């Protein structure tokens, strides 16, 4: 019987382009394979033992003959390739239509709305990850107080401001107003409000990021777990991605490792239910990304040694992020599905799942909740023979 599930979702953890990847310009995407090649091999022995090496030919990662976990790949049925798409589908909600793609940066009419609400000119406005924009425009922002603006090229608009330029609570409120103002235009599903701290040389995200977006259009695993009386904890951006619906409590963090710390702490406090954490490990510079991924792998034993009978751990991703691509933004890829836990089966090939909703369905069944709207549970495959 499963009593507690720890779901670790690594942002951009791709293992190869999906069949429709070419439609997104991602036909050759393979996040982990290309990352490993760039650094002459990854050292991730704990992920290796879970079965990661069975999913792709990743330099430095063996295809072990006796994995301690069950392994497979998750695909996505929903169009798109960002965290909203990934998390919602994992939660059991498949979107039918893709959001408008902003291939030329933040549209001028949206820039006008943002500048009107802030009462200031914006800087940036292009397609990039936040770290790139901070390096490019951090000095100008510190000198002028102008909000740094960017998009992922899809349905997300990001806004960053230093705490000295605007109080974090006021900044969040204005970003909330922006989300309301642009929702009717159908351009952005999500507005990210990222407060900053430090000086230009050390400018970095501050704890307190908020993601403002529409609620999921259907019943999610969070809803059914909440209805069944389960404890549901979101670490990182999870709470905001579901507009808080069905979650007991949120634990915002400023980094992937801080999120992992939070998970370790929650294992001593949460006796049952679901703990889900978003882990942003793939920095834009490949060397740093490799170090962080390897550092995460080294810390996995901290998690494993705290598990008890009735626990299940799932390690997966929400989309790819192939850092060999110039934009270094999200890519349309399969993501790993690695599952382990005391008294669970070892070495079972879970195959290539056509939809990430299989995760939500499995979690709902394992914790005794009603079915979510879509997805096929793989719980039976995890039972020891």
Model-derived features with residue positions:
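Feature captures the catalytic ectodomains and active-site-proximal regions of enzymes
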Residues: 1-385
């Amino acid at each position: 019987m499963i009593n507690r599930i720890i779901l670790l979702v690594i942002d951009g953890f791709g293992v190869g382009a999906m069949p429709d990847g070419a439609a997104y310009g991602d036909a050759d995407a393979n996040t982990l394979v290309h990352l490993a090649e760039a650094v002459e091999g990854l050292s991730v022995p704990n992920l290796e033992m879970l079965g990661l090496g069975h999913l792709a030919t990743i330099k430095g990662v063996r295809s072990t003959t006796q994995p301690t976990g069950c392994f497979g790949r998750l695909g996505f049925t929903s169009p798109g390739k960002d965290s909203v798409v990934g998390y919602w589908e994992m939660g059991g909600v498949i979107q039918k239509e893709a959001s408008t793609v902003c291939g030329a940066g933040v549209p001028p009419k949206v820039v006008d709305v943002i500048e009107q609400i802030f009462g200031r000119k914006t800087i940036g406005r292009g397609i990039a990850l936040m770290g790139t924009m901070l390096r490019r425009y951090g000095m100008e922002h510190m000198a002028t107080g102008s909000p740094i603006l960017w998009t992922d090229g899809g349905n997300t608009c990001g806004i960053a401001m230093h705490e000295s330029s605007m109080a974090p609570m006021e900044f969040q409120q204005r970003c909330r107003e922006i989300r309301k103002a642009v929702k009717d235009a159908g351009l952005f599903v999500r507005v990210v409000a990222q407060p900053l701290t430090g000086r230009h040389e050390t400018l970095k995200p501050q704890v307190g990021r908020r993601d403002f977006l529409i609620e999921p259009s259907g019943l999610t695993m969070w809803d059914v777990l909440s209805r069944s009386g389960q404890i549901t904890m979101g670490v990182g951006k999870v709470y905001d991605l579901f507009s808080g619906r069905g979650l007991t409590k949120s634990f915002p963090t400023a980094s992937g490792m801080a999120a992992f710390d939070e998970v370790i702490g929650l294992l001593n406090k949460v006796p049952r239910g679901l703990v889900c954490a978003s882990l942003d490990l793939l920095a834009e510079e490949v060397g740093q990304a490799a170090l962080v991924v390897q550092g995460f792998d080294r810390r996995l034993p901290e998690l494993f040694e705290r598990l008890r009978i009735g626990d299940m751990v799932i390690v997966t991703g929400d989309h790819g992020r192939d850092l060999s691509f110039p934009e270094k933004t999200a890519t349309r890829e399969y993501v790993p599905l690695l599952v382990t836990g005391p008294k669970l089966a070892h070495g079972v090939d879970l195959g290539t799942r056509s939809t990430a909703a299989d995760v939500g369905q499995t979690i709902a069944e394992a914790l005794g909740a009603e079915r979510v709207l879509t997805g096929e549970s793989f719980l039976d495959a995890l039972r020891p023979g």
